[in-house]
Amino acid sequence: MSRQTATALPTGTSKCPPSQRVPTLSGTTASNSDLASLFECPVCFDYVLPPILQCQSGHLVCSNCRPKLTCCPTCRGPLGSIRNLAMEKVANSVLFPCKYASSGCEVTLPHTDKAEHEELCEFRPYSCPCPGASCKWQGSLDAVMPHLLHQHKSITTLQGEDIVFLATDINLPGAVDWVMMQSCFGFHFMLVLEKQEKYDGHQQFFAIVQLIGTRKQAENFAYRLELNGHRRRLTWEATPRSIHEGIATAIMNSDCLVFDTSIAQLFAENGNLGINVTISMC
């Protein structure tokens, strides 16, 4: 079966907030959701978590909103720095919803685990997976591909699990990125070749594949990158990264195909570098 080839061009480098609500408790035992609602911040409606500070009248504000305020948003009294140890003890026995509950996450967990979960939560908004910091778009997973198709039209997409990624003008000076898309098995993959300037003008290339999908979905696939030519071969095989985690950490840790300019020249022709890309299901 012949490989498709795509050419990747370098991309270059107020109203007063409502009062805190007091839940109506039915029966003698408060439900977990009733207790959690006691900790709602009256400004942002996120949760007030330990260490908990109150105003002189006992009203609470979360740690994110507190530095932005000059008085209590509920009673307009001075904020003060009074520690509410009783509410902190209650917080230790409450399971709080994930901050992305409105997006579909159904997890409830202790406040000590909340921040770590939310950092990895699959319902957290996705950022644009294109390398570089120029695009600040964020949205749901379902909206990623429409965003790429409408806002990044220069990115080529090839169909099939076995294709050739052709990066042009690899001798361009400075930091450069090459990007293309590969569609197979009902999913979309983003292939990235990144050139970085290191010390003393030394340059390194980093090639990696990421799935337009969740971490769990990414575990179902493997990818192989291969430089092949002039009776030489250089191969890298790994699990694709999810765009949820991105590729910055993998590149920083060299957890991808890494080679320098001297290696690149062994496989390049007329300043262009072809990388064979194969996606397979595990």
Swiss-Prot record:
Chain ranges of zinc fingers (RING-type): 41-76
GO MF annotations, alphabetized: ubiquitin conjugating enzyme binding; ubiquitin protein ligase activity; ubiquitin-protein transferase activity; zinc ion binding
Pathway listed: Protein modification; protein ubiquitination
A single GO cellular-component term on record: cytosol
Keywords: Metal-binding, Transferase, Ubl conjugation pathway, Zinc, Zinc-finger
EC number: 2.3.2.27
Residues given in the record as Zn(2+) 1 binding sites: 98, 105, 117, 121
Its biological purpose: E3 ubiquitin-protein ligase that mediates ubiquitination and subsequent proteasomal degradation of target proteins. E3 ubiquitin ligases accept ubiquitin from an E2 ubiquitin-conjugating enzyme in the form of a thioester and then directly transfers the ubiquitin to targeted substrates. It probably triggers the ubiquitin-mediated degradation of different substrates.
Family per similarity comment: Belongs to the SINA (Seven in absentia) family.
Protein name from the UniProt record: E3 ubiquitin-protein ligase Siah1
Organism: Danio rerio (Zebrafish)
Organism classification: Eukaryota, Metazoa, Chordata, Craniata, Vertebrata
Gene: siah1
